[in-house]
Amino acid sequence: MLAKRIVPCLDVKDGKVVKGVQFRNHAIVGDIVPLAARYAIEGADELVFYDISASAHGKVIDKSWVSRVAEQIDIPFCVAGGIKTLAQAREKLAFGADKISINSPALTDPDLISRLQDEFGRQCIVIGIDSFFDAASNSYKVKQFTGDEAATKDTQWYTQDWVEEVQKRGCGEIVLNVMNQDGVRGGYDIKQLSMVRSICDVPLIASGGAGTMAHFKDVFEQAKVDAALAASVFHKGIIDIGELKQYLHANNIAIRL
């Protein structure tokens, strides 16, 4: 059995790591490189960096901190934020990123997924999906430009349809960001993740809702995800990554210690 992965997420805005609640009211939590180094030392399997305002404001991730992170850590990391062209993706990979994640640009130009996959191979192409449960219609819908509350907009896509579409176009991995759960630390959305797992043939990363070690165990056991992403519980020291991995191992979850 492949080991499950623990993935700290670092949302970046104006060169600092920030964290919000339900994608709003972001506050600064630290500097990029020291936090990345800390998580690598603590035993993270991988890191994800989102430049949360890049797509909404027509910008691209700042390559300077990408190279600094690559110099400081020896675990894989993925970067996202405003990547719309092969040249932009190539630059981030050249500066040391192991994977490229695209979210809003793929919704604007779905064929971008295929072009990236053809050029770099699907193993390094991650699709981020910002999924919102709409109670009025009792459905999961995909949102775009979520890094800026004023720019956030609805799309034509239901989550399950977009999950199937991005796989057809060649993505190698999916991160499902459950917007309703984000930052509230009430647990992952097992129901939605299980639904996506049933139609997802590529690695699936759960994002949004981690508050306790048991939440990680539950999402691995019940939703069968390949990795669990979290931010605030790590940033605020609520959960230590090493202790989390020992807990998961003790509960018979395959994990790298």
Swiss-Prot record:
InterPro entries: Aldolase_TIM, His_biosynth, HisF, IGPS_HisA/HisF, RibuloseP-bd_barrel. Keywords: Amino-acid biosynthesis, Cytoplasm, Histidine biosynthesis, Lyase. Pathway: Amino-acid biosynthesis; L-histidine biosynthesis; L-histidine from 5-phospho-alpha-D-ribose 1-diphosphate: step 5/9. GO terms for cellular component: cytoplasm. The keyword Membrane does not apply. One of its GO terms (biological process) is L-histidine biosynthetic process. It is found in: Cytoplasm. Signal peptide: none annotated. It is an enzyme of class 4 (lyase). It comes from the Bacteria. The active site is at 11, 130. Its EC number is 4.3.2.10. GO terms for molecular function: imidazoleglycerol-phosphate synthase activity; lyase activity. Its main location: cytoplasm. It catalyses: 5-[(5-phospho-1-deoxy-D-ribulos-1-ylimino)methylamino]-1-(5-phospho-beta-D-ribosyl)imidazole-4-carboxamide + L-glutamine = D-erythro-1-(imidazol-4-yl)glycerol 3-phosphate + 5-amino-1-(5-phospho-beta-D-ribosyl)imidazole-4-carboxamide + L-glutamate + H(+). Heterodimer of HisH and HisF. IGPS catalyzes the conversion of PRFAR and glutamine to IGP, AICAR and glutamate. The HisF subunit catalyzes the cyclization activity that produces IGP and AICAR from PRFAR using the ammonia provided by the HisH subunit. Belongs to the HisA/HisF family. This is Imidazole glycerol phosphate synthase subunit HisF.
